[in-house]
Amino acid sequence: MKVINSSRKVQIPENVTVDVKGRSVKVTGPRGTLSKSFDHASVDINLVGKKELTVDLWFGNRKQIACIKTITSIIENMITGVTKGYEYKMRFVYAHFPINVAVTDGGRVVEIRNFFGEKIVRRIELLDGITCYRNEKAKDEIVLTGNSLELLSQSCATIQLRSAIKYKDVRKFLDGIYVSERNVLESN
């Protein structure tokens, strides 16, 4: 059964400006600018004044209607990113060989050494807009921060996958770098 019209609204805060061109959304706030294209979805994205954004779908089935909630959630995450920002904390887990992690190039590159006793250096370049630093308060922890939740999550997933032990039982060999905490940064 098709629903004639399905709509969701996103409230825009005072210090954020949103520009909509077709199905592309650009969000600007105190921490920077994020943009995203929703060309793959057949929805109408419109600004209602300066305080509200609506996402409409006409004659959609269940999967298309579910896409509306996804799009509004992504836009809300973009608004949170440009106003407050996001932070992920990752912990090192090892049984015998201590993992050495160095953050280089101004927080843009993570180098993993002595992983499972290996002599090679695993080098991971972070995505644009993501910075990393070692947490001085906690042992064996790095902190990644950024405005885009998607890019930050992808950078953490890349670090976790690059530090995974292949061809071994993951229940027994737990060594690696894992996300331990996810936070929204408080506005300064």
Swiss-Prot record:
Coiled coil residues, start to end: none
Any GO MF annotation of the entry: structural constituent of ribosome
Record Gene3D superfamilies: Ribosomal protein L6, alpha-beta domain (3.90.930.12)
InterPro entries for the chain: Ribosomal_uL6-like (IPR000702), Ribosomal_uL6-like_a/b-dom_sf (IPR036789), Ribosomal_uL6_a/b-dom (IPR020040), Ribosomal_uL6_CS2 (IPR002359)
Database matches in Pfam families: Ribosomal_L6
UniProt keyword terms in alphabetical order: Ribonucleoprotein, Ribosomal protein
Organism: Dictyostelium discoideum
Protein's name in the database: Large ribosomal subunit protein uL6
